């Protein structure tokens, strides 16, 4: 990555620190969360707030705060907030895929597992992708095509690990209460979902250990993983667009106001939506910027040009499929370009040897 790209990513992280956290303290949102946690109640929850999950007090305090924060999104009493949560949750899959691929390119499988569950995963889930993703992406250089550790990782394991470790807990936490789940069990599922980076990373490692060896080419496995990420992110974005239109909701409600023109918070739900808007906007923007810079770098190396039509298709995709869907597509196209160039190089060398 160039110094310009790195600077842009660091700027995204600084903006997240200001707009997400500093402004949340200034407008009273953090105080509102703390007050509800202290009073053992949360908006939309008729019963008591659950405060014991693991028996480890610091961890239980964190999970209680997560329950207070995510309850309005999972309960579904405000459709616009829940729809935005669906789009954000689905967009996390392409972002996490980029991190997983980079870690497995640099490390052996067990080392990659340790880094994901002890560093990248906790940072993303505890601090938020809006602040953390740009910094993680700034560490990534142009992916190496000939990485030895990458050849030992079957990218297809990303698919079942995310289905079981991320999507399934997310669906369980989204079940309506008290229609299907009790209020207590719903809080438990919300707390369980917080550990998805741990579950998915361990499952990837376990699936690889079980398979024993890679059954398909690395390029083909990467294609499957990118298609899965593209499908999930596109589905979440299309659900947001279509149901907003069917329910006659305003699309402008999903566009974050300028920080100097934000209305005062009237409720916890408004604060949650504002927080998620900045989190999604900055993390998706940073990841898309990284993907575009990666593609531009590879295209320049191959002495190619990016056509105006491809830029137009990218803009249309961002609007109708979502920014992170285009990240998955751009990443796959760029890796394919690298693979194609890598296959041509040995053939050219072989022809040169024959001529000599």
Curated annotation (Swiss-Prot):
The keyword Translocase does not apply. Its EC number is 5.4.99.-. This is Terpene cyclase paxA. Paxilline synthesis protein A: Part of the gene cluster that mediates the biosynthesis of paxilline, a mycotoxin that acts as an inhibitor of mammalian maxi-K channels. PaxG, the geranylgeranyl diphosphate (GGPP) synthase is proposed to catalyze the first step in paxilline biosynthesis. Condensation of indole-3-glycerol phosphate with GGPP by paxC then forms 3-geranylgeranylindole (3-GGI), followed by epoxidation and cyclization of this intermediate (by paxM and paxB) to form paspaline. Coiled coil: none annotated. One of its GO terms (biological process) is paxilline biosynthetic process. Belongs to the membrane-bound ascI terpene cyclase family. It is an enzyme of class 5 (isomerase). The chain crosses the membrane at residues 81-101, 116-136, 161-181, 187-207, 227-247, 275-294, 314-334. Keywords: Isomerase, Membrane, Signal, Transmembrane, Transmembrane helix. It is found in: Membrane. GO terms for molecular function: isomerase activity. Disruption phenotype: Impairs the production of paxilline. Pathway: Secondary metabolite biosynthesis. It is a multi-pass membrane protein. GO terms for cellular component: membrane. It comes from Penicillium paxilli. Its main location: membrane. Residues 1-16 form the signal peptide.
């Amino acid at each position: 990555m160039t110094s310009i790209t790195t600077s842009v990513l660091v700027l995204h992280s600084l903006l997240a620190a200001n707009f997400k956290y500093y402004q949340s303290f200034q407008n009273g949102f953090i105080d509102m969360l703390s007050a509800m946690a202290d009073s053992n109640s949360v908006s939309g929850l008729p019963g008591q707030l659950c405060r014991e999950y693991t028996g480890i007090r610091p961890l239980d305090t964190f999970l209680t705060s997560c329950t207070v924060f995510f309850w309005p999104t999972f309960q579904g009493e405000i459709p616009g907030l829940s729809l935005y949560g669906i789009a954000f949750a689905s967009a996390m899959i392409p972002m996490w895929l980029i991190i997983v691929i980079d870690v497995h390119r640099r490390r052996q499988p067990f080392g990659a597992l340790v880094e994901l569950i002890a560093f990248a995963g906790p940072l993303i889930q505890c601090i938020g992708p809006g602040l953390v993703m740009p910094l993680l992406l700034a560490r990534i250089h142009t992916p190496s095509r000939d990485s030895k550790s990458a050849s030992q990782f079957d990218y297809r394991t990303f698919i079942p690990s995310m289905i079981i470790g991320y999507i399934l807990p997310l669906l369980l936490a989204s079940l309506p209460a008290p229609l299907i789940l009790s209020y207590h069990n719903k809080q438990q599922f919300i707390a369980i979902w917080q550990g998805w980076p741990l579950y998915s990373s361990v499952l990837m490692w376990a699936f690889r250990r079980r398979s024993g060896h890679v059954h398909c080419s690395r390029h083909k496995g990467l294609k499957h993983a990118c298609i899965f990420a593209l499908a999930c992110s596109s589905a979440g974005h299309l659900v947001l667009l279509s149901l907003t239109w069917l329910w006659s909701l305003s699309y402008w409600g999903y566009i974050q106001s300028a920080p100097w023109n934000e209305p005062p918070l009237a409720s916890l739900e408004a604060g949650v939506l504002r927080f998620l808007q900045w989190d999604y906007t900055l993390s998706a923007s940073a990841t898309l910027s990284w993907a575009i810079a990666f593609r531009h770098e590879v295209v320049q190396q191959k002495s190619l040009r990016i056509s105006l039509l491809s830029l137009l298709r990218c803009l249309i995709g961002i609007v109708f499929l979502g920014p992170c869907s285009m990240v998955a597509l751009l990443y796959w196209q760029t890796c394919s370009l690298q693979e194609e160039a890598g296959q041509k190089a040995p053939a050219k060398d072989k022809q040169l040897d024959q001529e000599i």
